[in-house]
């Protein structure tokens, strides 16, 4: 083996190019000047390096060291990119070793298709670092990590990416510079496996062994999706692998056709005991799922220069009003609309999954199909692109008669980059006014105005609200958007107060926004880490109301969850509950709120994880999970009593 330095003019040219690249990074992200100088010196030395290896056993040993060492280096660089020193220190050694093995599997699989170990290392390292970079920005934008189920959401993410600011920190710059040095070094090592078939067999065998070992060691490991827990508890690469595992839904304990039949026998009536049937005319039902609409005071108290939502706060007649648990934070809106429309819960699905893109069947029974079965015309409105979250495919399957997307709205009526709530509500009014005589109308609308992020400034948006004391620009913009939503809401309610036909309006937020961590720390004293279950559920709490333009009892609801809201809306409208909604109405008495994080225990007076449930609470949760599994995954034996879908 011979190692020598050979200085050439071409290396100086390469150095100049590399230093220009590094200088641009230095301009974008200020870091110590000695790092820039050190990078230049190392790069020039590496490019001037010549390595010659003749001994075949030394080549073999170098191949092994290069693959194993590169895997370990990549795994640690991923962690360095994503976590600060304090969080990096939290991961246990055995989990870090599993992350190295995950990276090694990638290297081995790539090696099967290449003879050159250096090329394998470059491809594998760059692929894994780009992958980690995607997670770096995803976490920056939405406050939780990129996992396997997000792959189906790439088109949606790209469509709103322009509204976010892409910012690198110093760790990201160091990772980029170190990767450049690594690639330059590996290119200097020219070693190959001469016997390709033998090499492929060995690589595949080791990869299979690694996968089996990882599977055995992680059998009881939970995929983490909250904030950066996946990275500092499991390691990001391993956590992502676990999210792949979670896409396969297992049959719940105690599931059988006989158990479903027993439940059918309990809920096969007409539901008249649940609702008031003395209604002369079915009401028009309008649902507004308001993008990122939240009452941040549930997280902690704060002061503003003006009241944020004065009109919403003033509503008190003919209204059921309160707070509901969502299953998502900062993103994944369709899971909230799915919970509302179907009555199902994300509690029994893998963390981070998106139902619209993974689990929608050909016959998804919901409030849409139920209302359509009793003569309603069902309309969906969303002032954004139809391909977002695959809504253009999902909505017709759900049974909607009409769908209205961005091209059906006035695209000059924008606040920041999104169509305003006012324009959405005017479109709702327009559709109501154009309805046929005796047409029963159901409108499901999803707004877009308040979508994150909240850091960029816009000439078409005058921010009126600001927090007093510590001020955060993203929080001020978000609260100002809520203030605009409140004005639009007043228009919507005022209009339908004046019409003669009965109208019910259901309004709720899909999830809380992802804002500056320090802002949350000012609210609850902790930020987003180290929270109790009750404090964590506060971040998943959104406001809701069910209002009618005719006389109904005013009711305050301390806590419920989105999966119950459609049942509550049907009850309030005087419409007979289908069997599944009857079940949910009964369950709500014992389990008033349930979401992806846990449930509210009436007996204990606090939130708990599902696995902590005992007695009657556990029985209701088990029945719920059995029915949801039957609905979504046991198509051959799907209950026609609970899930009739469309009857016409």
Predicted regions and their residues:
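Extended hydrophobic/aromatic-rich secondary-structure runs
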Residues: 52-59, 237, 241, 248-265, ...
């Amino acid at each position: 083996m011979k190692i020598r330095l050979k200085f050439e003019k071409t290396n100086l040219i390469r150095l100049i190019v590399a230093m220009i690249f590094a200088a641009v990074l230095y301009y974008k992200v200020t870091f110590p000047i000695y790092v820039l100088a050190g990078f230049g010196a190392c790069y020039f030395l590496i490019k001037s390096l010549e390595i010659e290896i003749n001994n075949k056993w030394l080549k073999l040993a170098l191949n092994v060291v290069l693959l194993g060492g590169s895997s370990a280096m990549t795994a640690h660089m991923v962690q360095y990119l994503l976590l600060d020193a304090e969080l990096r220190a939290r991961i246990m050694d055995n989990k870090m070793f599993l992350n190295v093995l995950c990276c090694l599997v990638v290297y081995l699989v790539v090696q099967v298709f290449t003879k050159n170990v250096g090329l394998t290392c470059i491809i594998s390292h760059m692929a894994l670092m780009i992958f980690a970079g995607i997670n770096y920005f995803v976490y920056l934008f939405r406050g939780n990590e990129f996992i396997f189920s997000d792959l189906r959401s790439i088109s949606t993410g790209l469509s709103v990416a322009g509204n976010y600011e892409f910012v690198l920190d110093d760790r990201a710059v160091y990772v980029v510079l170190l990767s450049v040095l690594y690639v330059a070094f590996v290119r200097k090592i020219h070693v190959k496996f001469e016997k390709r078939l033998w090499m492929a067999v060995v690589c595949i065998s080791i990869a299979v062994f690694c996968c089996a070992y990882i599977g055995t060691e992680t059998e009881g490991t939970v995929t983490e999706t909250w904030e950066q827990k996946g990275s500092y508890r499991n390691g990001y690469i391993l956590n992502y692998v676990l999210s792949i595992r979670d896409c396969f839904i297992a049959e719940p304990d105690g599931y059988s056709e006989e158990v479903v039949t027993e439940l059918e026998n309990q809920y096969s009536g007409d539901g008249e005991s649940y609702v008031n049937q003395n209604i002369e005319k079915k009401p028009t039902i309008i649902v507004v799922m308001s993008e990122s609409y939240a009452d941040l005071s549930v997280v902690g108290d704060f002061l503003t220069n003006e009241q944020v939502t004065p009109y919403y706060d003033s509503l008190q007649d003919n209204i059921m009003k309160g707070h509901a648990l969502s299953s998502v934070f900062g993103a994944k809106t369709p899971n909230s609309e799915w919970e509302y429309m179907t009555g199902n819960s994300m509690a029994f699905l893998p963390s981070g999954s998106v139902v619209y893109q993974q689990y929608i069947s050909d016959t998804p029974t919901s409030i849409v199909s139920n209302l359509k079965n009793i003569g309603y015309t069902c309309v969906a409105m969303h002032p954004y692109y139809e391909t977002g979250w695959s809504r253009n495919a999902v909505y017709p399957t759900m049974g909607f008669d009409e769908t209205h997307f961005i091209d059906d709205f006035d695209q000059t009526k924008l606040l920041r980059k999104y169509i305003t709530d006012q324009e959405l509500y005017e479109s709702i009014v327009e559709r109501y006014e154009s309805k046929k005589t005796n047409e029963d109308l159901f409108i499901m609308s999803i707004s877009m105005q308040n979508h994150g992020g909240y850091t960029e400034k816009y000439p078409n948006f005058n921010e009126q609200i600001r927090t007093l004391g510590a001020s955060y620009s993203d929080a001020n913009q978000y609260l100002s958007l809520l203030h605009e939503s409140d004005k639009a809401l007043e228009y919507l309610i005022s209009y339908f107060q004046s019409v003669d036909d009965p109208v019910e309006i259901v309004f709720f937020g899909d999830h809380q926004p992802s804002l500056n961590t320090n802002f949350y720390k000012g609210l609850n004293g902790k930020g987003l880490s180290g929270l109790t279950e009750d404090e964590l559920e506060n971040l998943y709490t959104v406001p809701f109301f069910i209002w009618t333009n005719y006389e109904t009892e005013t009711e305050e609801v301390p806590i419920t969850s989105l999966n119950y809201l459609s049942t509550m809306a049907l009850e309030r409208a005087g419409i007979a509950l289908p069997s599944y909604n009857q079940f949910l109405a009964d369950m709500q008495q014992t389990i008033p709120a349930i979401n992806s994080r846990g449930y509210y225990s009436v007996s204990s007076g606090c939130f708990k994880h599902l696995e902590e449930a005992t007695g009657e609470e556990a029985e209701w949760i088990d029945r719920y999970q059995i029915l949801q599994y039957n609905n979504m995954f046991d198509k051959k034996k799907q209950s026609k009593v609970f899930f009739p879908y469309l009857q016409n």
